[in-house]
From Swiss-Prot:
EC number(s) from the headed UniProt entry: 2.7.4.22
MF-aspect GO terms: ATP binding; UMP kinase activity
Binding site for ATP: K16, I17, S18, G19, G59, R63, T166, Y172, D175
Pfam families the record matches: AA_kinase
Name of the protein: Uridylate kinase
Gene Ontology CC terms, in alphabetical order: cytoplasm
Gene encoding the protein: pyrH
Pathway(s) per entry: Pyrimidine metabolism; CTP biosynthesis via de novo pathway; UDP from UMP (UMPK route): step 1/1
Subunit structure: Homohexamer.
Family indicated by similarity: Belongs to the UMP kinase family.
Subcellular localization: Cytoplasm
Signal peptide range in chain numbering: none
């Protein structure tokens, strides 16, 4: 007799991860074993029947702000960063489909040969069919981060929460890598995140989540089974919500 899957806490979620989460220890680019490990985390949540949206940053390949700081025109640098997110999305799509999970890459910048254009109703239909939707190219506009893009798409897709996968198991009052006495919050309000500059997401993303009462769950992507554990009512994390 097989053990039934636990009931998931959410029906539809947005998973936001940085591009750096896919580069492993190599310091740049994509590390295929790391991409596959993250894909398996997504697979374990997909098995619970959860509808999954994803947004992946592009910082492992190119950061628009860094390019701008080095003299490149900001708009051009941001577009380059958006293209980097498409590369990461395609890598994740390949890994997920290798695990048998139907996946769609949906780009805010039209590139029909490699990704679908963003059409909200079509994306919702993909989710209803249990396809993972990876939203790429940010919002399609410069000056907006992938955190803001993830929050925007999460609202448009009627996600019940954003899961922000990081290197630490929640939000701390100070950097736990530098301060042994750093304390983790179980819950924290949007306004406290902004006022204390806790670095969960950029201010625009936090404000957009707050204005739409969209919870943000901050957890460690490096913890095996952490994503699934939270959805099954376990694990360590911080919940950002009023």
């Amino acid at each position: 007799m097989t053990t039934p899957e636990p009931q998931a806490a959410f029906k539809r979620v947005m998973l936001k991860i940085s591009g750096e989460a896919l580069m492993g220890d190599q310091g740049f680019g994509l590390h295929p074993p790391t991409v596959e490990r993250v894909a398996r985390e997504v697979q374990s949540v997909h098995a619970l029947g959860v509808e999954i949206c994803m947004v992946i940053g592009g910082g492992n390949i190119f950061r628009g702000l860094q390019g701008s700081a080095q003299g490149m025109e900001r708009t051009t640098a941001d577009y380059m960063g958006m293209l980097a997110t498409v590369m990461n999305a395609l890598a994740m799509q390949s890994a997920l489909e290798g695990l048998g999970i139907h996946t769609r890459v949906i780009s805010a910048i039209t590139m029909n040969e490699v990704a679908e254009p963003y059409i909200r109703r079509r994306a919702v239909r993909h989710l209803e069919k249990k396809r993972v939707c990876i939203f790429a190219a940010g919002t399609g506009n410069p000056y907006f981060t992938t955190d803001t893009a993830a929050t925007l798409r999460a609202n448009e897709m009627s996600c019940e929460a954003i899961f922000k996968g990081t290197k630490v198991d929640g939000v701390y009052d100070k950097d736990p890598a530098k301060f042994a006495d750093a304390k983790r919050y179980d819950t924290v309000t949007y306004d406290d995140v902004l006022a204390k500059r806790l670095g969960v997401m950029d201010a625009s993303a936090i404000a957009l989540a707050r204005d739409n009462n969209l919870p943000i769950i901050v957890f460690s992507l490096d913890e095996p089974g952490g994503f699934r554990g939270i959805l099954a009512g376990e694990g360590t994390y911080t919940r950002v919500q009023d």
